[in-house]
Amino acid sequence: MKMNNPVLILGAGISGLGAAYKLSCNGQQTVVLEKDTTYGGLCGNFTIDGFRFDRFVHFSFAKDEQVNRIFMDGAGEVFRHVPNAYNLYQGIWIKHPAQNNLYPLSQKMKDAVVRDFLSRPTDIDSSQIQNYDQWLRLQFGHFFAEHFPIPYTKKYWMTEAKDLETRWMGSREGSRLYQPSVEEVIQGCNTSETPVTYYSKEMRYPRKGGFKQFLSALVENQDIRYNQQVISIDVENRLLRTSKGDEYQFDRLISSLPLPEVIKMLKNVPVDVCNAAARLHCTCGYQISVGLKTKNIPPYLWWYIYDEDILPARVYSPSLKSPDNVPEGRSEERRVGKEC
């Protein structure tokens, strides 16, 4: 069967749905092709015996008014959580971010962190920083960097900090990795009573339906066709084929799929482009979902694990995000690991 459509969008995750929503608001006809049986992508979820698990770790802390309006239209009611993330380091619970909440550590370790923090060079131009390893040492000193973010980077990103660039860190004000003052580091060594310095002051989550519920307003009145896995794209003839044998003629094509996968679908791709695609790196996440018969779990929405002998990089508790995620009287945890 051959179908004519002015704009085809590949993938019904948040990116593909966002593109369809924006175009339809401007009066443009769209068709979204999704290989799965429902929308959501990594923002989707699945349910086993009454336990609902998001496909990855999600909260909303968006500041854009339009995004928040769309999310609220979809979710209806939300829980508004104050971030209470913690860190697990050698059996010790440390408030997040660790760099200005070191109170539970031994005095010897705290002294080493403060000493290195005070001895950081202050006259280095940011343009001289060549990688993430250098950035971490410059921000926090050698001791803290080597015991906390550098080993965590290897666990989470499955690569060395020296192999990562730093543009993703953004500005000091917008960075997800808090950069405390000397006074904040010292205060966090002397007391556990410290203010919340997480990069977002509020984390929002739907009361019902999991994180996917935020996206439900995006799918209203959209032409989304499921079980449509794209296998080939003929750019010259503007023709796309799916594994079911359907063909779609397109004027414009928008893809939210991984770039190397799109390259495989295209015809007559130059060798240098194929080679460039093969050199691209990505990190894949794996989650272990656990439903528990008890509510007796740590009271933290999520926590990071710095110890290299413990495989998961972080753990989070969907039942604390919303009790709708679990049967009554139960709880759940998800352990997150990464693999190249």
Where on the chain are the PLM-derived regions?
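Local beta-strand N-terminus motif with an aromatic residue
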Residues: 5, 57, 250-251
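N-terminal Rossmann-like FAD-binding beta1-loop-alpha1 element of flavoenzymes
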Residues: 5-32
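Conserved Rossmann-like nucleotide-cofactor binding loop
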Residues: 15, 38, 260
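Glycine-rich FAD pyrophosphate-binding loop
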Residues: 24-47
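Dinucleotide-binding Rossmann-like beta1-alpha1 core, especially the glycine-rich loop
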Residues: 49-124, 167-174
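Active-site/ligand-binding neighborhood in enzyme catalytic cores
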Residues: 110-118, 122-238, 256
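Mid-domain catalytic core of redox enzymes
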Residues: 229-332
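Conserved small/polar residues in nucleotide/adenosyl-binding loops
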Residues: 333-340
